[in-house]
C-alpha cells in the first residue's frame, strides 16, 4: 500500500512540478518564504493564526494549480 501524501507534501510536489522555487512562490503570493516552508513542512508552530494560515494555503494551492 502506497503511503498517503500530506497536504504540505502535495503543495511542495505541485510547486516543484511547475519548476517554481520557494522564493518565487513567496514573491507571487506576498508571503514570507519561511512561512511557505512551514506550510510545506506542516509546522503549525511557525504559522500565523488559523484564519490567515487557511487563506495562505488556499492561495498557495491556487498558485500551483490545485483546487
Q: What residues fall within each predicted segment?
A:
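Cytosolic/nucleoplasmic/matrix-facing N-terminal domains/tails
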Residues: 1-67
Amino acid at each position: 500500500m502506497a503511503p498517503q501524501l500530506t497536504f504540505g507534501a502535495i503543495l511542495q510536489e505541485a510547486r516543484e512540478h511547475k519548476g517554481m522555487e520557494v522564493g518565487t512562490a513567496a514573491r507571487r503570493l506576498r508571503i514570507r518564504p519561511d512561512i511557505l516552508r512551514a506550510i510545506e513542512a506542516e509546522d503549525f508552530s511557525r504559522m500565523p493564526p488559523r484564519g490567515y494560515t487557511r487563506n495562505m494555503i488556499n492561495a498557495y494551492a491556487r498558485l500551483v494549480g490545485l483546487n
